[in-house]
Regions:
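Transmembrane alpha-helical segments in multi-pass inner-membrane proteins
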Residues: 197, 207-272
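Hydrophobic alpha-helical transmembrane segments
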Residues: 2-5, 34, 54-62, 84-87, ...
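Transmembrane helix-bundle core of multi-pass membrane transporters
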Residues: 94-158, 259-267, 293-305
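Hydrophobic core segments of alpha-helical transmembrane domains in multi-pass membrane transport
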Residues: 15-16, 40-44, 94-95, 142-154, ...
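Cytosolic-side transmembrane-helix boundaries in multi-pass membrane proteins
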Residues: 170, 176-177, 181-184, 255-305
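Membrane-interfacial amphipathic/re-entrant helices at transmembrane-helix boundaries
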Residues: 1-15, 28, 42, 50-55
Length: 305
């Protein structure tokens, strides 16, 4: 159960961290679902065509970054509405994934790719009864997600570049006046976020499936957007948020196998209901550290500085 929960939460972890990087520079990207779908479809296609898991992941990340580049150009350079642009990006990503998915609908993930997602055991720790096999025997993608979340935390909170990012998210005008290249940092973080979203989508399509399945993300991108708030824009808390949602989803699958008189549709709703309850709880606790970047969702007009 724990092993499944961690694996289920991993693609969401990638998307949450990607979303945090984007929102930290003041851009609310509701296109996470679209970027995940683009990464999922292109990653699956490249995996089938080459049998190389590394190329598949790089292609998936590039697809997510391409979607993020479109978003960045419209919202940073053209100063378009961030909410509308994000929604359009999700619709666009859904269409792209449907197109690519149609081309590879008869293909299967090669064994060379599937074998890359075999569990990697941590010496000694993986031998701990029950907990060891569930937690310390995971595939390389799970460990990569954890490493990226930790690196993102140190990048945002312990480096000069991270200080620039946080300054831009709070007050881009003041950051610009102090000599920080606001546009450059916005582009970099939005593209990095898109790359991570693409990786999350590819994990869903290549590690969990053998054949293509339309709408493979099943709303994971939207959940990630909500869990960004749950994690209070902290990549370390994102680990807990993602795995908690993974546990709720895993519990849903497990309970459906029990002989209890609860509609399966209600069980499917449980993770989403829990997410809403948590968001309400966080909204009621008006703590300073729980607040989003002050410039989140606002276009920056340098001439009005």
């Amino acid at each position: 159960f724990l092993q499944t929960a961690i694996q289920t939460g991993t693609p969401i972890l990638f998307a949450i961290v990607g979303g945090i990087l984007c929102e930290k520079v003041g851009h609310m990207n509701l296109g996470v679902e679209g970027m995940m779908l683009m990464g999922a479809s292109l990653g699956f296609a490249v995996a089938c065509a080459t049998g190389n898991p590394l190329l598949a992941m790089l292609a998936a990340g590039a697809a997510g970054a391409a979607g993020a580049l479109i978003y960045a150009f419209i919202t940073v350079t053209l100063r378009g509405n961030q909410v509308v642009t994000g929604l359009v990006l999700t619709i666009f990503g859904t269409g792209v994934s449907g197109l690519i998915g149609g081309w590879v609908s008869s293909e299967q993930i090669p064994q060379s790719v599937s074998s890359a997602f075999r569990p990697v055991e941590i010496p000694v720790l993986s031998k701990i009864p029950v907990l060891g096999e569930a937690v310390f025997s995971q595939d390389i993608y799970v460990w990569l997600g954890l490493v990226i979340a930790v690196l993102a935390y140190f990048y945002l909170n312990k480096t000069k570049l991270g200080l620039y990012v946080r300054a831009i998210g709070e007050n881009p005008g003041a950051a610009d006046a102090s000599g920080i290249n606001v546009t450059l940092h916005k582009y970099i973080n939005i593209l990095l976020g898109g790359f991570l979203c693409g990786l999350g989508g590819a994990y869903l399509s290549t590690a969990f499936l053998t054949t293509w399945q339309d709408n493979v993300t099943a709303g994971a991108g939207w959940i990630a957007v909500a869990l960004i708030i749950f994690s209070t824009w902290n990549p370390l808390k994102a680990i807990f948020a993602a795995y908690l949602f993974g546990m709720l989803r895993g519990l849903n699958y497990k309970m459906q196998g029990w002989e209890i008189q609860i509609p399966s549709q209600f069980l499917t709703m449980l993770p989403y209901i829990a997410t809403i309850i948590v968001l309400i709880f966080i909204a009621m606790r008006k703590k300073k550290e729980n607040q989003p970047p002050k410039a989140l969702g606002e276009a920056y007009f340098r001439e009005e500085r």
